[in-house]
């Protein structure tokens, strides 16, 4: 992205024209004071001269636009100073495949942590790289840790993630594969089973302004949703609005220090057991899904669903009046009728009352179809016929009469009748 600078190259700006000061001095103002018609004529002449001068300066004024390219990303460390150091001995057996020690005490791994050699500075280190020309590029892991020696020649992005940087849920913003479950120490890449935006920050030096210190250091890596600090235990929970920013902040603040010389322990946070937090997370996911659906649908359709389309309101008021002036049907009746029309496939049908009255029972179907309604009573003749059909439509069925004896005689082999 290029920066734009505007330079005024008009002749008036380049060379100052000599001007005559016609403003009267203080002494002259006391002696000569225009009044009445003389004052009006003098004011009109000054206004006319000013308008002519502004018109001439507008015609001669030109602008020259200079486009400056974005600055390239700078190398964070000198490549000549890079050297591979063996890891500190924390166990009894060295694994050459994983370059780790094993067999040591489990609690020693937190006490033997070494401070990070460098820290990323977004304002100074960020810039364009080769990855900016490739769509879908991942972010540089070594840039987040502050030890990338390649600078603008790096194949990964050297900047902060934004809301427009979307990746598959099975990888993080650095392109590393996620797992189905978290590690026992809640470290590493994380899990793809749920979207985690909260970091656990431990081993913080306890002070009175610990919340302000944590918010100031972690706000550098993205927009923070909320921060919860346990002052007595030196523990903080930082929640970002974007998951990619949480992944970037986890790698950027690992083994770093705040205002003191502590070594932070940054891990993924477990699920918050607070019911209010779970409801808040569920509501956020619903809003995110609704926003995704809203972006996928046309703007006119979304406006009609949300009741912000004036044409839809006007059409509803006209077509849904059912022939009654001033009547506006409720939403339930409107959507039920619309769903019925969609099921029949009649797109041009309007929401009007049916021509034939609907019968309540099947017994009323025997009434004549073209009855003339009488206007002498309260109810119409069709309504009276429908009410009569309620009583006459009930049909009772009698059971078949049972035979009193066998239908045919039968013979017996026994002769003792």
Curated annotation (Swiss-Prot):
Write out the biased-composition intervals (Basic residues).
60-73
GO MF terms on file? pre-mRNA binding; U6 snRNA binding; zinc ion binding
Q: Which domain of life is it from?
A: Eukaryota
Q: Where are the zinc fingers (C3H1-type)?
A: 134-161
The molecule here is called Pre-mRNA-splicing factor cwc2
Instruction: Region Disordered: list its residue ranges.
Output: 1-89, 391-417
Keyword list, A-Z: Cell cycle, Metal-binding, mRNA processing, mRNA splicing, Nucleus, RNA-binding, Spliceosome, Zinc, Zinc-finger
Entry note about domains: The C-terminal RRM domain and the zinc finger motif are necessary for RNA-binding.
| Gene3D superfamilies (UniProt xref) | 3.30.70.330
Please give the biological process terms from Gene Ontology that the record holds.
mRNA cis splicing, via spliceosome; positive regulation of cell cycle; positive regulation of RNA splicing; spliceosomal snRNP assembly
Transmembrane regions listed in the UniProt entry = none
Cellular compartments annotated: Nucleus
Family listed: Belongs to the RRM CWC2 family.
Q: Which InterPro entries does the UniProt record give?
A: Cwc2/Slt11 (IPR039171), Cwc2_RRM (IPR034181), Nucleotide-bd_a/b_plait_sf (IPR012677), RBD_domain_sf (IPR035979), RRM_dom (IPR000504), Torus (IPR032297), Znf_CCCH (IPR000571), Znf_CCCH_sf (IPR036855)
* Keyword Transport included in the entry's annotation: no
What residue spans carry the Polar residues bias annotation?
A: 40-57
Q: Does the keyword Lipoprotein apply?
A: no
Single GO cellular component term? U2-type catalytic step 2 spliceosome
Q: Which PANTHER family match?
A: PRE-MRNA-SPLICING FACTOR CWC2 (PTHR14089:SF2), PRE-MRNA-SPLICING FACTOR RBM22 (PTHR14089)
Its function? Involved in the first step of pre-mRNA splicing. Required for cell growth and cell cycle control. Plays a role in the levels of the U1, U4, U5 and U6 snRNAs and the maintenance of the U4/U6 snRNA complex. May provide the link between the 'nineteen complex' NTC spliceosome protein complex and the spliceosome through the U6 snRNA. Associates predominantly with U6 snRNAs in assembled active spliceosomes. Binds directly to the internal stem-loop (ISL) domain of the U6 snRNA and to the pre-mRNA intron near the 5' splice site during the activation and catalytic phases of the spliceosome cycle.
Organism listed in the record: Emericella nidulans (strain FGSC A4 / ATCC 38163 / CBS 112.46 / NRRL 194 / M139)
The RRM domain covers 197-271
């Amino acid at each position: 992205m290029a920066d734009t600078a505007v330079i005024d190259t008009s002749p008036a700006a380049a060379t100052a024209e000599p001007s005559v000061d016609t403003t009267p001095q203080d002494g002259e103002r006391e002696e000569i004071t225009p009044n009445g018609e003389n004052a009006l004529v003098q004011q009109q002449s000054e206004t006319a001269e000013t308008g002519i001068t502004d018109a001439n300066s507008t015609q001669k004024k030109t602008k020259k636009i200079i486009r400056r390219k974005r600055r390239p990303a700078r190398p964070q460390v000198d490549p000549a100073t890079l050297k591979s150091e063996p890891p500190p001995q924390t166990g009894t057996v060295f694994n050459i495949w994983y370059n780790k020690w094993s067999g040591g005490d489990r609690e020693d791994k937190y006490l033997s942590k070494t401070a990070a050699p460098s820290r990323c500075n977004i304002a100074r280190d960020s810039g364009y790289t080769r990855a900016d020309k490739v769509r879908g590029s991942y972010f540089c892991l070594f840039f987040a840790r502050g030890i990338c020696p390649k600078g603008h020649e790096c194949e990964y992005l050297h900047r902060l993630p934004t809301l427009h940087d979307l990746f598959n849920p099975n990888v993080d913003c650095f392109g590393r594969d996620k797992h189905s479950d978290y590690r026992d120490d809640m470290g590493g890449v994380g899990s793809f089973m749920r979207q985690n935006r909260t970091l656990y920050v431990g081993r913080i030096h306890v002070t009175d302004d610990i919340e302000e210190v944590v918010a100031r250091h972690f706000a550098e890596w993205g927009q923070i949703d909320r921060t919860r600090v346990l002052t007595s235990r030196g523990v903080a929970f930082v929640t970002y609005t974007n998951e990619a920013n949480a992944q970037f902040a986890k790698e950027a603040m690992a083994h770093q220090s705040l205002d003191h010389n502590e070594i932070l322990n940054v891990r993924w946070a477990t699920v918050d057991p607070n019911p209010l937090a779970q409801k808040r997370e569920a509501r956020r996911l619903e809003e995110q899904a609704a926003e995704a659906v809203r972006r996928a649908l046309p703007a006119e359709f979304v406006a009609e669903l949300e009741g912000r389309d004036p044409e839809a309101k006007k059409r509803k008021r006209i077509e849904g009046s059912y022939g009654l002036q001033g009547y506006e049907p409720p939403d339930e009746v409107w959507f039920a009728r619309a769903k019925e029309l969609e099921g029949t496939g009649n797109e041009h049908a309007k929401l009007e009352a049916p021509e034939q009255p609907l019968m309540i029972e099947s017994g009323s179907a025997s009434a004549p179809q073209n009855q003339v309604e009488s206007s002498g009573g309260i109810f119409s003749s069709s309504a009276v016929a429908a009410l009569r059909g309620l009583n006459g439509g009930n049909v009772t069925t009698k059971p078949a009469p049972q035979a009193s004896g066998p239908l045919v005689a039968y013979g017996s082999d026994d002769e003792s009748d």
